[in-house]
């Protein structure tokens, strides 16, 4: 049954990721991918902290959210492809800004999620 929940979570995450991708513009800053990945980092941190208090009795739900929903929502491969595209088009400042923003804020938001979740549990 766990596979079914992961499948459902994945379908919902993929759908949301698809809808967010419309925020990306041709040749512009990939804001949709950035939003999806930073949101995923925050929620993963939050759920990590909340696992002990709220998900210990519901491991299947946690897997549905983390592996299914967040796994489909976030997209490391698209992020890498966008960086290569920027490199190929000599958009070096945008590439650097996107990479640093994604990594630094991803780590920061995951940390904030962990701290916030720890305060709630």
Curated annotation (Swiss-Prot):
Activity regulation behaviour: Na(+) is not transported, but it plays an essential structural role and its presence is essential for fluoride channel function.
Membrane topology: Multi-pass membrane protein
GO terms for cellular component: plasma membrane
Binding annotation for Na(+): 71, 74
Transmembrane segments: 3-23, 35-55, 64-84, 92-112
UniProt family annotation: Belongs to the fluoride channel Fluc/FEX (TC 1.A.43) family.
Protein name, as recorded: Fluoride-specific ion channel FluC 1
């Amino acid at each position: 049954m766990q596979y079914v929940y992961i499948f459902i979570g994945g379908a919902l995450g993929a759908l949301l990721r698809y809808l967010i991708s419309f925020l990306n513009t041709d040749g512009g800053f990939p804001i949709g991918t950035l939003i999806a990945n930073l949101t995923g980092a925050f929620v993963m941190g939050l759920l990590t902290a909340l696992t002990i208090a709220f998900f210990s009795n519901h491991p299947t739900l946690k897997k549905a959210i983390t592996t299914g929903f967040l796994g489909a929502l976030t997209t490391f491969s698209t992020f890498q492809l966008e960086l290569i595209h920027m490199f190929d088009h000599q958009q070096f400042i945008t590439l650097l800004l996107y990479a640093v923003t994604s990594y630094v804020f991803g780590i920061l938001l995951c940390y904030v999620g962990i701290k916030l979740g720890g305060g709630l549990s």
